[in-house]
């Protein structure tokens, strides 16, 4: 304790009272008035009596906390001091002065205490800072060790494969263990209403806002309630899904949101909750969110022709769609992201099988096969038949996956530019690697109009016409925009063709003028040398 405790040690003064030695003890924080009162009480004098202290050689001693200490052998003598009678005014002044002096004394004592407390706090803060630095270092070490373990695990599980390219990125699969920090946006009634319609403008929203919209859909459809989904786990899962979509021009997280929002709007538009079980709705929504996870931006044709790791792994059978499924269930396998944690094992098996079936159905190579099967069932469609329902769910996710042209033109058309950009990136790479190039992906052969007309005419319209037979409401809301979109691109193609024809004529006239002039000069010379017969 040392110096810290010595400052609080009381002071002892010895008084000689009629030959009797009286010891008086007081703290250094007492003021002069308190000490004088204490001496008066010790000598039997009335309080407030003015007294003086004398040493053994009759020298006067100042009565205050700093007065010199003495011993039993050298006690101070106490002498009352005779004072004149003072007026009431003087007594009042003296009282006020005494109070002021006492306040000053207290103020000085408070300042001293403040200084001591401040010094003590400074010492504690320094200690906390040092301890905090230790914690930071420990956490950094833990993080480094965790990264090293993950890298070692990835290396141990990696198979040596003679593939040309690998698109896997296992680092993304590690979910965030803390509660996701993206802001929880409070959706306005107008946004909630618009979110249920196919006309929703998906370009107006930032990623955090799209995450909040997806979270709202699960609550609004009753999925969080019916399957006891932990809201924090739902947010963490959505954030992990977001992190596992790549920044491709087309196949990115916004496309994921676009497809899921269209599925959500079809649930409300077609009254699907009356036709399907809640588990079916959960499968439809979750498959839509996961259907393009970790898409590398190069389609199945490229994967197969380039003999990539995905093509080899899945034996050229829907390599991308199989990869999307695998990533989806790797994320769900993490306890922190398992939104199906409360679902019984048999229920989870059904959900898993349903999601795999729907995601694999998005492979456009299977389009004709799925459409033919669905048309067969349409003749006697039975909602109680599980096979019929499965085919309908496959058609629904296919509709949502390629539904951009269902939206208003100002929302749909930018997606065409995004898709063509991704196509051109692939065709450029295929040319550089000596691989086959599809004409509809070649930047030298395709235009926006030619890319869309055939797709709308032979894929989109027939598929949505089939769905309209089950849900007539689809015709006005979804089929009519497709007809209008087809007309728009046909007009655009006519304009493109007219411009090309005009360009050809201009080039022909420009390149043919010198030749025609030469021929005319030659004819004139010939006519001069050969006169026509009479």
From Swiss-Prot:
> Which catalysed reactions does the entry list for this protein?
3',5'-cyclic GMP + H2O = GMP + H(+)
* Active site positions, chain numbering: 251
* Annotated region (Disordered), positions in chain: 500-534
Residue positions annotated to bind 3',5'-cyclic GMP are: 251-255, 292, 401, 423, 451-452
Instruction: Give a single Pfam family match.
Output: PDEase_I
Q: According to its UniProt record, in which pathway does this protein act?
A: Purine metabolism; 3',5'-cyclic GMP degradation; GMP from 3',5'-cyclic GMP: step 1/1
Annotated residues for binding of Mg(2+): 292
* Activity regulation statement: Inhibited by SCH 51866 and moderately, by zaprinast. Specifically inhibited by PF-04447943 (6-[(3S,4S)-4-methyl-1-(pyrimidin-2-ylmethyl)pyrrolidin-3-yl]-1-(tetrahydro-2H-pyran-4-yl)-1,5-dihydro-4H-pyrazolo[3,4-d]pyrimidin-4-one).
List, as start-end ranges, the regions of compositional bias called Basic and acidic residues: 517-534
Where is this protein chiefly located? membrane
* Domain PDEase positions: 175-496
Q: Look up the record and name the cofactor or cofactors this protein needs.
A: Zn(2+); Mg(2+)
PROSITE patterns associated with the record? PDEASE_I_1, PDEASE_I_2
What are the entry keywords?
Cell membrane, Cell projection, cGMP, Cytoplasm, Endoplasmic reticulum, Golgi apparatus, Hydrolase, Magnesium, Membrane, Metal-binding, Phosphoprotein, Zinc
| SMART domains for the chain | HDc
Does this UniProt record's set of keywords contain Cell cycle? no
Residues bearing the modification Phosphoserine: 318
Tell me which Gene3D superfamilies the record gives.
3'5'-cyclic nucleotide phosphodiesterase, catalytic domain
Provide the assembly information. Answer: Homodimer.
Q: Describe the family membership recorded for this protein in Swiss-Prot or TrEMBL.
A: Belongs to the cyclic nucleotide phosphodiesterase family. PDE9 subfamily.
Job description of the protein = Specifically hydrolyzes the second messenger cGMP, which is a key regulator of many important physiological processes. Highly specific: compared to other members of the cyclic nucleotide phosphodiesterase family, has the highest affinity and selectivity for cGMP. Specifically regulates natriuretic-peptide-dependent cGMP signaling in heart, acting as a regulator of cardiac hypertrophy in myocytes and muscle. Does not regulate nitric oxide-dependent cGMP in heart.
The molecule here is called: High affinity cGMP-specific 3',5'-cyclic phosphodiesterase 9A
The protein's organism comes out as Mus musculus (Mouse)
Q: Which gene encodes it?
A: Pde9a
């Amino acid at each position: 304790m040392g110096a810290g405790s010595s400052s609080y040690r009381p002071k002892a003064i010895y008084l000689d009272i009629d030959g009797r030695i009286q010891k008086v003890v007081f703290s250094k924080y007492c003021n002069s008035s308190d000490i004088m009162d204490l001496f008066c009480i010790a000598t039997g004098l009335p309080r407030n009596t003015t007294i003086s202290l004398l040493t053994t050689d009759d020298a006067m001693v100042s009565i205050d906390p700093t007065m010199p200490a003495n011993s039993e052998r050298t006690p101070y003598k106490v002498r009352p001091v005779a004072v004149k009678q003072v007026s009431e005014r003087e007594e009042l002044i003296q009282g006020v002065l005494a109070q002021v002096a006492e306040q000053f004394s207290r103020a000085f004592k408070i300042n001293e205490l403040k200084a001591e407390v401040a010094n003590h706090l400074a010492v504690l803060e320094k200690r906390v800072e040092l301890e905090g630095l230790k914690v930071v270092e420990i956490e950094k070490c833990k993080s480094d060790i965790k990264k090293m373990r993950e890298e070692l695990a990835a290396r141990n599980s990696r198979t040596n494969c003679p593939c040309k390219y690998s698109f896997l990125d296992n680092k993304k699969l590690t979910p965030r263990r803390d509660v996701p920090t993206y802001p929880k946006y409070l959706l306005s009634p107008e946004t909630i209403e618009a979110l249920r319609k196919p006309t929703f403008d998906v370009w107006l929203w930032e990623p955090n806002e799209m995450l909040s919209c997806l979270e709202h859909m699960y609550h609004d459809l009753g999925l969080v309630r019916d399957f006891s989904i932990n809201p924090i786990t739902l947010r963490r899962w959505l954030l992990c899904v977001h992190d596992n979509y790549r920044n491709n021009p087309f196949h990115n997280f916004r496309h994921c949101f676009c497809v899921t929002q269209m599925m959500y709007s079809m649930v409300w538009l077609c009254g699907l909750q009356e036709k399907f079980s809640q588990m079916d709705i959960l499968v439809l929504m979750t498959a839509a969110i996961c259907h393009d996870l970790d898409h590398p931006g190069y389609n199945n044709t490229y994967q197969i022709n380039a003999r990539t790791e995905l093509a080899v792994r899945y034996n050229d059978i829907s390599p991308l769609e199989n990869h999307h499924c695998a990533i989806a269930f790797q994320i769900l396998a993490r306890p922190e992201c398992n939104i199906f944690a409360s679902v019984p094992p048999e229920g989870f098996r059904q959900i898993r099988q349903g999601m795999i079936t729907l995601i694999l159905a998005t492979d456009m190579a299977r389009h004709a096969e799925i459409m033919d099967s669905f048309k067969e069932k349409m003749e006697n469609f039975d909602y109680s038949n599980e096979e019929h329902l499965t085919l309908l769910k496959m058609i629904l996710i296919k509709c949502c996956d390629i539904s951009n042209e269902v939206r208003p033109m100002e929302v749909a058309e930018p997606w065409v530019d995004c898709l063509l950009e991704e196509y051109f990136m692939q065709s450029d790479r295929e040319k550089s690697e000596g691989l086959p190039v599809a004409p509809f992906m070649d930047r030298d052969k395709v235009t926006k109009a030619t890319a869309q007309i055939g797709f709308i005419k032979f894929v989109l319209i027939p598929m949505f016409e089939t769905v309209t037979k089950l849900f007539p409401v689809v015709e006005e809301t979804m089929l009519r925009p497709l007809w209008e979109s087809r007309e728009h691109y046909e007009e655009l193609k006519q304009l493109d063709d007219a411009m090309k024809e005009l360009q050809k004529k201009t080039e022909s006239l420009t390149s043919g003028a010198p030749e025609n002039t030469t021929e005319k000069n030659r004819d004139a010379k010939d006519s001069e040398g050969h006169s026509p017969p009479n």
